[in-house]
Amino acid sequence: PDRREIMVVNLHFDWVEDDKFRFQQAKELAKYLDTLTLPYVLMGDFNDQPQSRTLDLLSRGTMAAVKPRQDRFTFPSMKPTIEIDFIFAAPREDWQLNFSRVLNGKVTSDHRPFLAVVELQP
């Protein structure tokens, strides 16, 4: 099939109550992402929630791998109460989300794993 190159970017943003540093990290990353000529997948522990300015900035122009509403929380793994792990693909029109879910199994991290199957469109 199609053998197009993509860029995969994994991140783990800082966790502090005040989001100033995290947002600064996001602005620097956004500058880098804007230079890419390849389609990309951005994923990781954003340590921020969906309505944050960090997520607003980094999700612009992307296809978000949306989690099932009833099972979207990823942290803490034993009894998750917040959604801070995300997967985005850009540019939006190049990608299709085929499947997504938060996995609930043997605990190997303080976060539950988030799985998404995204397909690069021809």
Predicted segment positions?
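Beta-strand-turn-beta hairpins that frame and shape the catalytic cleft
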Residues: P1-L11, V118-P122
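Surface-exposed cleft-lining segments at the edges of enzyme active sites
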Residues: L11-D19
